[in-house]
Amino acid sequence: MGRYTDSVCRQCRREGEKLFLKGDRCYSEKCSVSRRAYPPGAHGQGRRQKPSEYGIQLREKQKTRRIYGIQEKQFRNYFRKADRKQGITGDNLLVLLERRLDNVVYRLGFASSRKEARQLVNHGHFFINGHKANIPSMLVRVGDIIEVRQSSRESNKFQEMKEQAAYKTPPEWLSVDAEKMTGTVLAYPRREQIDTLVNEQLIVELYSR
């Protein structure tokens, strides 16, 4: 299955809540969820049936996939990896998703959305520990130093991000030096440090069927 290419605003409306897929627009009056708080399509404003238990679990999985921009096969692989680890499977899953390079770039404030972060990583704008890193799904490790490529730092895009990053506070497991355009992974995130509004237990129940 290819990557979803339709309007990201439609994805938020389908879930009935903001997934913050479009950066600053999600915080503005232009947000589609604020203006049209009903699902997309001809029957979007019609009466909605009460979802089944399976339907609720499926929606939660789809929502999480959309938030992190991950395809089904890759998401299932993350779940299997999380299930093999010690600890709580749902927590392990979210930690793996948070460790993705595109997510870390977003969390550091070097991109306005995960989608933009993925594009910037793909285009080779970032280094990890001095080596070029252009794979969005790469999992960062404790101690990794992420930096904007030297030749990219003077671009208008990154100068703007530099100014914005100076006013943003990264999660506790990351540190950022906005002036030098670098960030460091201090630790792996704990569940309480992840502000993504998902119920991961529903995903565990879905895949455990």
From Swiss-Prot:
InterPro entries: Ribosomal_uS4, Ribosomal_uS4_bac-type, Ribosomal_uS4_CS, Ribosomal_uS4_N, S4_RNA-bd, S4_RNA-bd_sf
S4 RNA-binding domain ranges (all copies): 99-162
Keyword match tRNA-binding: no
Gene3D superfamilies found in the cross-reference section: Ribosomal Protein S4 Delta 41, Chain A, domain 1, RNA-binding S4 domain
Residue ranges that the Swiss-Prot or TrEMBL entry lists as coiled coil: none
Domain of life: Bacteria
GO cellular component: small ribosomal subunit
CDD domains reported in the protein's UniProt record: S4
Molecular-function annotations in GO: rRNA binding; structural constituent of ribosome
Keyword Zinc tagged: no
Pfam assignment, any one: Ribosomal_S4
Keywords recorded for this protein, A-Z: Ribonucleoprotein, Ribosomal protein, RNA-binding, rRNA-binding
GO biological process: one example: ribosomal small subunit biogenesis
Function: One of the primary rRNA binding proteins, it binds directly to 16S rRNA where it nucleates assembly of the body of the 30S subunit.
Family: Belongs to the universal ribosomal protein uS4 family.
Subunit (UniProt): Part of the 30S ribosomal subunit. Contacts protein S5. The interaction surface between S4 and S5 is involved in control of translational fidelity.
HAMAP family for this protein: Ribosomal_uS4_B
Protein name from the UniProt record: Small ribosomal subunit protein uS4
UniProt source species: Syntrophomonas wolfei subsp. wolfei (strain DSM 2245B / Goettingen)
